């Protein structure tokens, strides 16, 4: 699927934030457009106290390290003046990443043919969560088809999802998606690849913690050194997962006024 999709700064998002995140989005969306960037998402978290996570990109979907720093420098004083958070916070600016949110019609068009998770509100025919392969949105940008795997007999395998009811959507991380993302954006730097390996290890550890396995019985006695005592990590045969481009700033309460 070609990545040459027409998109511009004026294209509205289908998904909007609420509460403090909405106030942050309102404060920065216009200035971002003035710099040639589009806001993807604002999310608040309790990481390191309070963290404001901002995803942005250019209309063509790219976002370099220089872009990230430029956005961080531009919106930091704006948030200082408007003070939508109302306290000290950490500011993180990043690219959308590979398993990115889909927030505009052009996002669905650009990533047609790839797997995604979509949530609707209100539900469609009693169902609000869908996972499958995206098709291209209809010419009016009203609906997007999704092909569902393993559908029960008698039920449709393709459903047209109304984008006006979109609550949340994001791509599903697959080897195919990683390869295509690398093709479009270029390979990551060496340090980014190392960070990606660490993130991948954390994901594996989290999965293991959620589904613990019983350890095999080990007889008591002196421990013998053995090259097979510690299982070796299997080499990844596919492309490495690049990390998102990110810049962070700490905003102390005393510096907000």
UniProtKB/Swiss-Prot annotation:
Gene Ontology BP terms: ribosomal small subunit assembly; translation
Composition-biased stretches (Low complexity): 224-236
Pfam families for this protein: DUF150_C, RimP_N
Record keyword Cytoplasm present: yes
Listed transmembrane segments: none
Source species, domain of life: Bacteria
PANTHER family for this protein: RIBOSOME MATURATION FACTOR RIMP (PTHR33867:SF1)
Name of the protein in its database record: Ribosome maturation factor RimP
Source organism: Methylobacterium radiotolerans (strain ATCC 27329 / DSM 1819 / JCM 2831 / NBRC 15690 / NCIMB 10815 / 0-1)
